[in-house]
């Protein structure tokens, strides 16, 4: 018995030893599992997913699988480097686990494929949170030609149909929500960002819990093992909705989301893992590359075709397709779970793997090529009729990620260079038709999708209409980025925390634009040279001959030197003088020259009405100035419907030569409104005033018609005088028609025409000749009709029936007086006529410098007087009522037959003129220069008497006889000037005269109204005969009453002429009824608008002048 019981303690000891060994082995295995290498996991965005985390996976015999990932994070790369230093034994002892390919699709589902079992689907789970993308931004009615396309990672892109380019918007969904709740006056933004975490069984796909802002929900199941590995999915969804603030109706919306994956081994929940291990998906600069040690063992590559919705596995060495899986929904993200690590799969790796070793020397180049393809890819796809974008990591890095992109600080702006993606779409396969092998399932997916390609055509781009096109790759070319860089200015918060996210502007290469740059520089040089030459280097003016005159009012034509042409606008601007005329008025155009000044049309800057501004240069003597001012004050008080209204007057004393320089600048700037019309030197007639008996009182006018020969001329001689004095002979005037060759014999060159254009001169026509082409006007006109000139087309029809130019020069230049007296002047005239063939030249009326025309009067000016310093010039500006350019002279020239002139209308016009003259006489004034060219029409066709340059008081003292530079032998009244053809005999003879001189002029105007002329020669002859009371028989027979009245008005004796009141009450006007006759005499100032808006058309009221 003792022997039998002895071995029992030994058996117990052996049993204890066996149990201890088993426990030791179990502890060692447990310790090994705890010492296995691990790494943290961070979440990525879409295709750019997170780095890996290591965990123990049950050892399963499987082939080596690897994924080329150009977008893995650097942290994981560092881990691989550390692991590469491990011993080979440690590498062999590492446990191998199952390989799963986790796929996230746009419909919100998660699927797992078994990489070792030919891609068989391990599990498929719908978490019930809806699709990842939903938007109404692609509809054309939202943004028109431009639209906003969201990206799955939260970036926004703007598509421009016109430019066919896509640009990144400088803010994300988060910054759009955080910047302001109000997007515009009619849009309010609402929405937010939601984070949801899902816990899944790694290999069964069963949902264990869901955690969100509302709390966590768990599914307890006995089937779930405690040690089963967990896949941690985190879904980020961002939603923005735009609603109307009043109605609450939704205008547009979009929502984008993405999944992030992490692998949790065993039961370790690691409290606080979100703070310690999760990284922002926006950190896109990390990447992971498999170490060289592992690359020696791998032989399979997992690739994702975004366009075909496929996941494929290739043999790395042979490039053979091992397996593929077709999804029915676009793929958003993909991961490979192997050996306890999560490796993101690039969706944009389009590298071809082939067995050809010559193409790429080693496997390292393959990785670099895959990385290059990944960098420059953007995919534009469509899901359920909604466009969306998937961008690679390298392209996404170039997009701004500031959350406060729309906010501003201190009004400062920051410039962000945004990448522009050109519309150069690349289809995903060389052939637009799908490959036959394996395409049946894909066709089935298309047929089952209710959002077919007919629905896709409703999208904004209308590009995905081919049945097998689901999207396009948009390469991001570096050379295009270097050529052009789109810059969008946005405002940022001045925070140093964000300074590291700003990318510097890429260098712009200008070599591609060398032609445009060269052309722009050349154009700038030419334009600058032209402007400088025109403004600062004007052409030198031609100087006027000393013996030459052109209706000059002021002594403006002094010696003109080349230095004057160098004066620029800067000299005038810096002179310090401010003109009231230029301050209060805006000049429009020059309307012409009156008896004493220049008339401008100008617009008042305050009331916006147009007025006629007359500029008169006052005489140098104080007595003369007082007289002119007294006359202006008297005229300003005249208020009558038949008189041009005066509104305002002021004096200006500009610096020396300031006004001349301003006039020259006006000429250059307003050249279209200042053309000159003149007879051609070949066609210009000559007007010869022959020397007659100085004691003869008979007026003689001889008209010689121009001959067709080259040198043709006609002469008009007007000789008049007084029996009491031989010094009163009328000034002779001679014009000679010569060619341009005769002009070369002249001693002096012709003066610049432009310089004379703004001279205050005494011309017979005070208005611009409206019938001449280009609104031209005459510098030294006659009574020749502008209508006739335009009708005949030549200047040979111009007739100078008076010597207005002579008088104009005489009345304005006192130095001429010494040369106009007695026989001295007759002797000078004789010498002039003997040498006329040598020294005569044509009037400078043409703008052509090669055919000058000069008005030759052999009046020598004293050089000493010319060099004497002149006193400051004083100008009187008078603001008057603006009338039409057409005066009574133009009105009659357009009606050359009696049928064209209605008798009633002519009498109506004359009656209005007579009433205006009667009003003047009642105020103790006389006009002294009544003629058709001084009778105007307002915009509403009311007759107005104007041009009161020669108006004077009827009781003027004799000592004031020369205050306005009278002619040499005339001893009464201002200047003794006026148009000779309409002057009374006492004016021409230089005798004392009264207001009856206006009655004489009225008689000639009435005769000319009732008796039209076909030619100007006929007009000159007939009016000359009528002045001597020789009336045409037709006029006597047809108008007997008018004949008697005209005969009385033209009586040689002023005492026998009727008063203006008697004329108005004549029986001729009592037998006829005029439209508005009674209204005319009671017409107030309001019936004729004082100022008129800028309009050249007559009013629509009743016009007493038919055919105007």
Swiss-Prot record:
GO terms for biological process: angiogenesis; bone mineralization; calcium-mediated signaling; cellular response to amino acid starvation; cellular response to cold; cellular response to glucose starvation; chondrocyte development; endocrine pancreas development. This is Eukaryotic translation initiation factor 2-alpha kinase 3. It is found in: Endoplasmic reticulum membrane. Its EC number is 2.7.11.1, 2.7.10.2. Residues 585-1069 form the Protein kinase domain. GO terms for cellular component: cytoplasm; endoplasmic reticulum; endoplasmic reticulum membrane; endoplasmic reticulum quality control compartment; mitochondria-associated endoplasmic reticulum membrane contact site; nucleus; perinuclear region of cytoplasm. Inhibited by HSPA5/BIP in absence of stress. Perturbation in protein folding in the endoplasmic reticulum (ER) promotes reversible dissociation from HSPA5/BIP and oligomerization, resulting in trans-autophosphorylation and kinase activity induction. Inactivated following phosphorylation at Thr-794 by AKT (AKT1, AKT2 and/or AKT3). Inhibited by ATAD3A at mitochondria-endoplasmic reticulum contact sites, providing a safe haven for mitochondrial protein translation during ER stress. The gene is Eif2ak3.
């Amino acid at each position: 018995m003792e022997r039998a019981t002895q071995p029992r303690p030994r058996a117990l000891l052996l049993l204890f030893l066996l149990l201890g060994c088993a426990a030791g082995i179990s502890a060692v295995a447990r310790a090994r599992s705890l010492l296995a290498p691990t790494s943290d996991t961070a979440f990525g965005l879409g295709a750019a997913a997170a780095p890996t985390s290591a965990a123990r996976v049950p050892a399963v015999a499987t082939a080596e699988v690897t994924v080329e990932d150009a977008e893995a994070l650097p942290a994981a790369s560092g881990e691989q480097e550390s692991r590469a230093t491990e011993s080979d034994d440690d590498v062999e002892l590492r446990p191998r686990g199952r390989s799963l390919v986790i796929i996230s699709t746009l419909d919100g589902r998660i699927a797992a494929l078994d990489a070792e079992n030919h891609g068989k689907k391990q599990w498929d789970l719908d978490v019930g949170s809806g699709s990842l993308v939903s938007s109404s931004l692609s509809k054309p009615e939202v943004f028109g030609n431009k639209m906003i396309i969201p990206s799955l990672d939260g970036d926004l892109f703007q598509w421009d149909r016109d430019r066919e380019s896509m640009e990144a918007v400088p803010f994300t969904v988060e910054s759009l929500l955080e910047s302001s709740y109000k997007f515009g006056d009619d849009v309010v933004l609402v929405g937010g960002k939601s984070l949801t975490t899902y816990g899944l069984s790694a290999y069964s796909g069963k949902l264990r819990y869901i955690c969100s802002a509302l709390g966590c929900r768990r599914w307890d199941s006995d089937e779930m093992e405690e040690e089963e590995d967990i896949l941690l999915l985190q879904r980020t969804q961002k939603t923005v909705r735009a609603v109307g603030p009043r109605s609450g109706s939704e205008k547009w919306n979009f929502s984008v989301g993405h999944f992030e994956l992490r692998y949790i081994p065993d039961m370790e929940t690691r409290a606080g893992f979100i703070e310690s291990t999760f990284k922002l998906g926006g950190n896109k600069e990390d990447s992971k590359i498999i170490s060289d040690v592992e690359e020696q063992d791998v032989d399979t590559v997992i690739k994702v075709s975004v366009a075909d919705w496929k996941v494929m596995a290739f043999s790395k060495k042979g490039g053979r397709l091992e397996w593929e899986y077709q999804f029915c929904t676009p793929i958003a993200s993909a991961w490979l779970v192997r050996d306890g690590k999560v490796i993101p799969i690039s969706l944009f790796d389009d590298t071809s793997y082939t067995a050809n070793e010559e193409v790429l020397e080693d496997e390292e180049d393959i990785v670099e090529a895959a990385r290059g393809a990944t960098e420059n890819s953007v995919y534009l796809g469509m899901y359920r009729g909604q466009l969306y974008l998937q961008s690679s990591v390298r392209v996404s890095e170039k997009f701004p990620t500031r959350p406060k992109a729309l906010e501003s600080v201190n009004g400062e702006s920051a410039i962000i260079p945004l990448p522009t993606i050109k519309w150069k779409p690349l289809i995903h396969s060389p052939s637009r038709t799908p490959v036959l092998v394996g395409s049946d399932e894909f066709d089935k997916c298309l047929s089952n999708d209710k959002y077919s390609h007919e629905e896709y055509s409703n999208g904004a781009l209308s590009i995905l209409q081919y049945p097998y096109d689901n999207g396009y790759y948009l390469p991001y070319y570096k050379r295009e980025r270097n050529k052009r860089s789109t810059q969008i200015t946005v405002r940022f918060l001045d925070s140093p925390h964000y300074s590291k996210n700003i990318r510097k502007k890429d260098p712009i290469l200008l070599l591609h634009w060398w032609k445009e740059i060269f052309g722009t520089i050349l154009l700038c040089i030419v334009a600058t040279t032209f402007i400088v030459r025109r403004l600062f280097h004007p052409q030198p003016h031609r100087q006027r001959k000393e013996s030459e005159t052109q209706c000059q009012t002021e002594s403006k034509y002094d010696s003109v030197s080349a230095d004057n042409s160098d004066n620029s606008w800067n000299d005038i601007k810096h002179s310090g003088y401010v003109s009231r005329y230029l301050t209060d008025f805006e000049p429009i155009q020059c309307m012409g020259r009156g008896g004493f000044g220049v008339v401008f049309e100008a617009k008042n800057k305050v009331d916006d009405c147009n007025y006629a501004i007359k500029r008169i240069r006052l005489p140098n003597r104080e007595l003369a100035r007082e007289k002119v001012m007294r006359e202006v004050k008297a005229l300003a008080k005249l208020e009558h419907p038949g008189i041009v209204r005066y509104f305002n007057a002021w004096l200006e004393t500009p610096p020396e030569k300031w006004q001349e320089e301003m006039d020259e600048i006006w000429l250059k700037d307003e050249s279209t409104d200042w053309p000159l019309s003149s007879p051609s030197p070949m066609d210009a007639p000559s007007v010869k005033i022959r020397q007659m008996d100085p004691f003869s009182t008979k007026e003689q006018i001889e008209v010689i018609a121009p001959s067709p020969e080259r040198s043709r001329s006609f002469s008009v001689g007007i000789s008049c005088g007084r029996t009491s004095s031989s010094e009163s002979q009328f000034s002779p005037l001679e014009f000679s028609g010569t060619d341009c060759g005769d002009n070369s014999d002249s001693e002096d060159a012709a003066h610049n025409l432009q310089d004379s254009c703004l001279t205050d001169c005494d011309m017979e026509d005070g208005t611009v000749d409206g019938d001449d082409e280009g609104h031209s006007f005459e510098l030294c006109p006659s009574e020749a009709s502008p209508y006739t000139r335009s009708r005949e087309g030549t200047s040979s029809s111009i007739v100078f029936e008076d010597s207005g130019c002579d008088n104009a020069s005489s009345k304005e230049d006192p130095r001429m007086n010494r040369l106009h007296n007695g026989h001295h002047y007759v002797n000078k005239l004789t010498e002039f006529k003997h040498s006329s063939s040598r020294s005569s030249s044509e009037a400078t009326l043409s703008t052509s410098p090669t055919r000058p025309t000069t008005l030759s009067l052999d009046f020598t000016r004293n050089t000493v007087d010319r060099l004497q310093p002149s006193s400051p010039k004083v100008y009187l500006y008078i603001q008057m009522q603006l009338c039409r350019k057409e005066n009574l002279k133009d009105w009659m020239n357009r009606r050359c037959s009696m049928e064209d002139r209605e008798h009633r209308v002519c009498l109506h016009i004359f009656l209005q003129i007579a009433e205006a003259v009667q009003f003047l006489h009642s105020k103790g004034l006389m006009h002294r220069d009544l003629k058709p060219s001084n009778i105007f029409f307002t915009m509403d066709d009311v007759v107005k008497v104007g041009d009161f340059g020669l108006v004077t008081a009827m009781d003027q003292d004799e000592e004031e006889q020369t205050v306005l530079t009278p002619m040499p032998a005339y001893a009464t009244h201002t200047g003794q000037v006026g148009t000779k053809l309409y002057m009374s005999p006492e004016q021409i003879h230089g005798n004392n005269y009264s207001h009856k001189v206006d009655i004489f002029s009225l008689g000639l105007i009435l005769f000319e109204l009732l008796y039209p002329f076909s030619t100007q020669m006929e007009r000159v002859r007939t009016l000359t005969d009528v002045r001597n009371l020789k009336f045409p028989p037709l006029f006597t027979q047809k108008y007997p009453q008018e004949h008697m009245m005209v005969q009385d008005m033209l009586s040689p004796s002023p005492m026998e002429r009727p008063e203006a009141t008697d004329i108005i009450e004549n029986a001729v006007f009592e037998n006829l009824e005029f439209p508005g006759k009674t209204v005319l005499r009671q017409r107030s100032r309001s019936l004729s608008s004082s100022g008129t808006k800028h309009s050249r058309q007559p009013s629509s009221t009743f016009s007493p002048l038919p055919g105007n």
